[in-house]
A protein has these predicted regions:
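Hydrophobic face of amphipathic alpha-helices that form TPR/SEL1-like repeat modules
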Residues: 1-28, 465
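N-terminal alpha-helical segment of soluble enzymes
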Residues: 28-95, 295, 307
Length: 477
């Protein structure tokens, strides 16, 4: 693969001349693999101006045409599937096993968005339920919000862009995309694909930059909705800075999975091993806390340890690797420090936890205290903690004792146990006989507490990215 370039795309032009540069580093090898050209404040001002001008043009494009363009983009991505999988692995350090899956999911997300473009329906509401409106009638229509600002993270750099651009374009909005700096080459390549698919030149502005660029975009009154996926601290800043504009926030998690005494231990251990360490644990729904009934504690722990130690840690570009590396060495050092803190507080390190550059071997901690960061904060790294319980309600209480509430999992063969846990767990989603880390892209995805506001999934995001306009006929037809 040739040297990577990450470029802003503003007003129909790719910008690189006279811009501040940053090296793109392969996190696994530490080698420079390309250059990122950062947008200036003046570039961002132009992006805002062009998006503001383009929103009426976008709203005027028919639903059929928007659907057709999204379908074509999905087809092009299918043709370039392996190229994008390797690009994500190269820039992020995510194994090909995972990146191939991410590209497949991205194709589905675009296709689902194309379908939703044709479902922007309103309703007719009779007035005769009121004594004042016996002849009156109201009709509702879905109209675009205007300019959608999409701010995306590094951990799923293609699919989470699709989750914002797909619904936003399907609804007829102009879009400004600000991807994570760590994976801006993936975003650049994807915008090129959208243009190849026929997206109007000024429908989409791509801004390469960091926190300052994001702040300028969020606070400007010309953006009508901010769709942000990232950490809770960043989401809180955005919510406080956005004023009265709409915000759609998919934030952090502290994924808890309960393994009850009647669970299938082999199934539970296999899924916890797979979903606790996928993408080096860099997922907001990654399994982090595993509450295990004391009756099966020993058996589950040994089975999980065996499964985890079978995972292959290695080159992300190798099809044999199950785990690559973290996004950078700084992130790996933080996770290493959290593991060491848990050990000092009394936890037993059963396996893994050794760092080499940006890579950390999958770590299993036994019974860390609830005050340890690996329990009470979002680890966002390859670490799971096993915590014993005696009564189901005790496990539910501990799982709920978190500032986050994204997803949870429950393993049990009793329907009443499953339904009780699903009702009582304070999360946006509960997976039965699965872990917290399971999502299909058309489902309503999001959390409560510090895990976010609103729901993603094309059908549900479109609800956020449109307004309901009412037309009233006081005297009927």
């Amino acid at each position: 693969m040739s040297e990577l370039k990450a470029l802003s795309y503003i007003n129909g032009e790719w910008l690189d001349a006279n811009h501040v540069k940053e090296d793109i580093i392969n996190p696994y090898s530490g080698e420079m693999i390309g250059t990122s050209y950062l947008a200036s404040s003046e570039d961002i001002e132009q992006a805002l101006s062009i998006a503001q001008q383009a929103k009426k043009q976008l709203a005027a494009i028919s639903a059929l045409e928007r659907s057709t363009l999204l379908t074509k983009a999905a087809a092009l991505l299918e043709e370039q599937k392996e190229h994008f999988a390797k690009l994500i692995s190269l820039e992020l350090g995510k194994p090909l096993k995972n990146t191939r899956d991410e590209v497949s999911r991205s194709i589905e997300t675009l296709a689902q968005s194309a379908e939703e473009a044709n479902r922007l329906i309103g309703e007719t509401i009779p007035g005769n339920v009121s004594s004042r409106g016996q002849r009156a009638m109201a009709m509702t229509f879905k109209v675009p919000v205007g300019v959608v600002l999409a701010i995306t993270p590094f951990n799923a750099p293609l699919n989470l862009i699709c989750h914002k651009i797909g619904p936003a374009f399907a609804a007829g909005n102009a879009i400004i995309l600000k991807p994570a700096p760590q994976t801006s080459a993936v975003a650049t390549a994807f915008v090129k694909l959208l243009l190849e698919a026929g997206f109007p030149e000024k429908s989409l502005q791509l801004v390469i930059g960091g926190v300052d660029a994001g702040r300028q975009l969020v606070t400007d009154e010309r953006t009508n909705l901010v769709s942000f996926t990232g950490g809770a601290v960043g989401g809180e800043h955005i919510s406080n800075s956005a004023g009265l504009k709409k915000v759609l926030l998919e934030l952090g998690g502290n994924g808890a999975t309960i393994v009850h005494h009647d669970a299938d231990i082999e199934q539970a251990a296999s899924l916890c091993a797979k979903t606790g360490f996928s993408n080096s644990g860099q997922s907001c729904i990654s399994v982090q806390r595993i509450y295990v009934h004391k009756q099966i504690m020993s058996s589950f722990t040994e089975t999980l340890k065996q499964k985890v130690e079978q995972l292959v840690v290695g080159d992300p570009l190798s099809s044999e690797s199950d785990i690559g590396c973290m996004v950078d060495e700084q992130a790996a050092k933080r996770v290493e420090a959290w593991i060491q803190e848990a050990e000092k507080m009394g936890a037993e390190l059963l396996s893994g936890g050794q760092r080499n550059g940006a890579s950390i071997t999958p770590a299993i901690l036994l019974n860390p205290p609830k005050q340890a960061k690996v329990v009470c904060e979002e680890v966002f790294g390859p670490v799971v903690s096993i915590l014993p319980y005696e009564e189901l309600d005790e496990a539910i209480k501990e799982a709920n004792d978190s500032r986050y509430g994204l997803q949870a999992g429950v393993f049990t063969n009793q329907l009443d146990v499953a339904l009780h846990a699903a009702k009582e767990l304070e999360t946006g989603g509960v997976v039965i006989n699965g872990t917290s880390n399971f999502r299909l892209d058309h489902w309503p995805y999001g959390g409560i507490k510090r895990s976010g506001i609103g729901r993603e999934g094309p059908r549900f995001a479109i609800e956020e990215m449109t307004e309901t306009k009412m037309v009233v006929l006081p005297n009927g037809l």
